[in-house]
């Protein structure tokens, strides 16, 4: 949806089920595997490697590199000045439209941040993934390799004090500032990774394909955030290249909502973003060469080399569309809406053959400046721009802004800030002097405004919790319910904020609302007693007490098993209010399944073992940590609803390695249950007597060769103390996942 939001398309009558005649940049040709990989031989095998996405060995900076510490040495004003200078210094190897790279940098930042999707928190600009495949070679990212190369001298100058992830996003913010727009703020703090991460962007095997992500009338499958393989949001020519602005509005609304944007934010981003720069479709896209990942080695990562004319400047081909939205493409103003409503529009084609709109009957001819000093042009718009006028909801919004441009300015500033920062988590993670005040979408939590509990208080509170009548299983499940809502992808959820007691989390089926209410009532009583009697203004938040209670239960269960462990506890969590909790936004954190609790939502069709791996990935735990957590939680009796599946012990509530010992016992033979779906029965191999029941969440630790190797370690006779210690460490990690203040 930004200034070059879709590359030229193939003959989509065969490749995308479209009748579009738009030109195409050829799709990569899949190469035969030699040799075949394990995933080729066994495509349904779970991918345990996804739990180790960014090993420290991959970083040239070393495991001890501290980005916030390095960033603190950065002169951000000097950095901004240098980025501004790059923006207005045109390079012969890729000349700047209108002498200004602002539009290109906005598109680069937008397309980095805009991959974010709310359903699973993946995507976004937080790790600099645009540098790597597939994003660096997506059809929607044509020519963004040039934008990053323009910034290389700046990155080279400031070195590790500024990450690529931050610089890519910051450049777009600087572009707006340089063209007269007052931005809402900016937060640094995105740390680079050093290799691509496998993300399911879609099942289609051709660029610009759509056939495997839709069902029904036009129901976009979860968790996808884009309508089309290789695009950030939607096809700017309309659905499947059919130039229908009303149908395009449906796609726009759906895809932007999946990035957590409402109608006003969506319209603000489109109108605001398209107030700058232009798109590029000067000629035949068949003359454009391969993307960076397929380009010849001598091009050094430069892709899409074009033989149309000079291949750059006035001859540039990026999207195949040739649109300049306003008479002032390097200056903020209300020109986009003034033109959108100031003319009637007729459907035309770009020089590259892509559908777009031009002012009707030659109106406005010559009023739009040429980027390189040529004759003036006629006003033009994308199909998706006309959607802002033809869709009744977008029309009401944009007509109001036409009359009140100051409202557009404010809406765009806030929506742009949200776009750039949506995947960064709480504002406590932001660095730099330009961070705006906390916003509702950042899931704000209050600052600590009281003295924290000390070691003596912690010991006393643990004793009260354990004497409260609540069971080990209840305390463990409650703490797990709070902390396991965290997801590493966009740093949302977790125990901090105490939102387990608020809507929507307190009503989630996975959290067993009736039992949860009972536990919280007891813990709130303990909290109130302590806070009303503690000396020196000490208090404990319910968020802290929930975690402390779970940790006390783990320590007790370990002691009951003959093992002394200490679960680290750091107070400092606070309790958020319902008013500062966006119920609709939090709803996407509700688990479809949680294999750690042996929970699955009714009707879920995906294999449980795959959902377990996905859950572990979002929690940021390694394969060994996932293994020890599942085994320990089963021993503690922490299953959803008190289910006995996977509770391979005669002493539930005691922290032991019984899960692994009994899972790997060859005296047990497993078979699928005839009485219950997704349940397996473990019977004595000799007598046939039923011993245990399990789900795939349990049996995967015996069937998958990698996980079995880990399970064997914890089933060894010398592993009992190690198991208890490893469980305590993994438990503490999950409890502290959202404690960015401890990093």
Curated annotation (Swiss-Prot):
According to UniProt, the reaction catalysed is:
H2O2 + AH2 = A + 2 H2O; 2 H2O2 = O2 + 2 H2O
* Crosslink site: Tryptophyl-tyrosyl-methioninium (Trp-Tyr) (with M-259): 110-233
Query: Cofactor binding mode, per the note?
Result: Binds 1 heme b (iron(II)-protoporphyrin IX) group per dimer.
Site residues by UniProt (Transition state stabilizer): 107
InterPro entries of this UniProt entry?
Answer: Catalase_peroxidase (IPR000763), Haem_peroxidase (IPR002016), Haem_peroxidase_sf (IPR010255), Peroxidases_AS (IPR019794), Peroxidases_heam-ligand_BS (IPR019793)
Region of interest (Disordered), ranges: 1-40, 490-511
In short, the EC number is 1.11.1.21
Gene Ontology biological process terms from the UniProt entry: cellular response to hydrogen peroxide; hydrogen peroxide catabolic process
Tell me how the protein is altered or processed after translation.
Answer: Formation of the three residue Trp-Tyr-Met cross-link is important for the catalase, but not the peroxidase activity of the enzyme.
Q: What sort of enzyme, by top EC class, is this? A: oxidoreductase
Cofactor(s) needed:
heme b
Where along this sequence does the record place binding of heme b?
Answer: 274
**Active site per UniProt:** 111 (proton acceptor)
Chain intervals with Polar residues compositional bias? 1-15
| GO function terms (MF aspect) | catalase activity; heme binding; metal ion binding
The keyword Oxidoreductase belongs to this UniProt entry's keyword annotation: yes
Q: What is this protein called?
A: Catalase-peroxidase
């Amino acid at each position: 949806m930004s200034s070059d939001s879709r590359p030229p398309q193939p003959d989509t009558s065969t490749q995308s089920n479209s009748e579009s005649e738009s030109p195409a940049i050829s799709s990569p040709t899949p190469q035969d595997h030699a040799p075949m990989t394990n995933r080729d031989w066994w495509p349904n095998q779970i991918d345990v490697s996804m739990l180790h996405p960014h090993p420290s060995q991959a970083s040239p900076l070393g495991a001890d590199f501290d980005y916030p510490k390095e960033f603190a040495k950065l002169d951000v004003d000097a950095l901004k000045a240098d980025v501004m200078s790059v923006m207005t210094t045109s390079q012969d190897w890729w000349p700047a439209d209108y002498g200004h790279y602002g539009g290109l940098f906005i598109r680069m930042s937008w397309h980095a941040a805009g991959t974010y999707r709310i359903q699973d928190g993946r995507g976004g600009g937080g790790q600099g993934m645009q540098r790597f495949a597939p994003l660096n070679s997506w059809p929607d990212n044509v020519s963004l390799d040039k934008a990053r190369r323009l910034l290389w001298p700046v990155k080279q100058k400031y070195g590790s004090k500024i990450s690529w992830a931050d610089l890519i996003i910051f450049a777009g913010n600087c572009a707006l500032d340089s063209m007269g727009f007052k931005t809402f703020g900016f937060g640094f703090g995105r740390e680079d990774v050093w290799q691509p991460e496998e993300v399911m962007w879609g099942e289609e095997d051709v660029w610009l394909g759509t056939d495997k992500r839709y069902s029904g009338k036009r129901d976009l499958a979860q968790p996808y955030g884009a309508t089309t393989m290789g695009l950030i949001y939607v096809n700017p020519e309309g659905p499947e290249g059919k130039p229908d602005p009303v149908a395009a509005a449906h796609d726009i609304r759906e895809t932007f909502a999946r990035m957590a944007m409402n109608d006003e934010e969506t319209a603000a981003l489109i109108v605001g973003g398209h107030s700058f720069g232009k798109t590029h479709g000067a000629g035949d896209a068949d003359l454009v060469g391969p993307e960076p990942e397929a380009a010849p080695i001598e091009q050094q990562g430069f892709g899409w080399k074009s033989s149309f004319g000079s291949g750059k400047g006035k001859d540039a081909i990026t999207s195949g569309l040739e649109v300049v939205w306003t008479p002032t493409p390097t200056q903020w103003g209300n020109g986009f809406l003034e033109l959108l409503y100031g003319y009637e529009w007729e459907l035309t084609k770009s020089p590259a053959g892509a559908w777009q709109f031009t002012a009707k009957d030659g109106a406005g001819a010559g009023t739009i400046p040429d980027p390189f000093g040529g004759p003036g042009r006629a006003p033009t718009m994308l199909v998706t721009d006309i959607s802002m006028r033809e869709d009744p909801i977008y029309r009401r919004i944009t007509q109001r802004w036409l009359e009140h441009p100051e409202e557009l300015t404010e809406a765009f500033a806030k929506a742009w800030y949200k776009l750039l920062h949506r995947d960064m988590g709480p504002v406590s993670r932001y660095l730099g002097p330009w961070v705006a005040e906390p916003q509702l979408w950042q899931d704000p939590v209050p600052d600590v405004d009281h003295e924290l509990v000390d070691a003596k208080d912690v010991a006393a509170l643990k004793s009260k919790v354990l004497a409260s009548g609540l069971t080990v299983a209840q305390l463990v499940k409650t703490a797990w319910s709070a902390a396991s809502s965290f997801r590493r992808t966009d740093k949302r959820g977790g125990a901090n904020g105490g939102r387990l007691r608020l809507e929507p989390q307190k009503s989630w089926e996975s959290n067993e609302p009736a039992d949860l209410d009972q536990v919280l009532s007891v813990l709130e009583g303990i909290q109130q007693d302590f806070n009303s009697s503690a000396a020196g203004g000490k208090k404990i938040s319910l968020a802290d007490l929930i975690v402390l209670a779970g940790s006390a239960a783990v320590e007790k269960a370990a002691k009951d098993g003959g093992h002394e462990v200490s679960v680290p506890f750091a107070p400092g969590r606070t309790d958020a209010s319902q008013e500062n909790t966006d119920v609709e936004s939090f709803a996407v954190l509700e688990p479809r399944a949680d294999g750690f609790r042996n929970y699955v939502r009714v009707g879920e069709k995906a294999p449980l073992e795959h959902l377990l791996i996905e859950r572990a990935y979002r929690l940021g735990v390694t394969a060994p940590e996932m293994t020890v957590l599942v085994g320990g939680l089963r021993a503690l009796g922490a299953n959803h609803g008190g289910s006995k599946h996977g509770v391979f012990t005669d002493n539930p509530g005691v922290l032991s390695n019984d899960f692994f010992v009994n899972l790997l016992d060859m005296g047990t033979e497993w078979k699928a249950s005839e009485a219950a779906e997704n349940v397996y029965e473990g019977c004595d191999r000799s007598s046939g007597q039923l011993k245990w029941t399990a789900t795939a969440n349990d049996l995967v630790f015996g069937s998958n060769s990698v996980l079995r190797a880990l399970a064997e370690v914890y089933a060894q006779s010398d592993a009992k103390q190690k198991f208890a210690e490893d469980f305590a460490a993994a438990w503490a990690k999950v409890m502290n996942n959202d404690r960015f203040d401890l990093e």
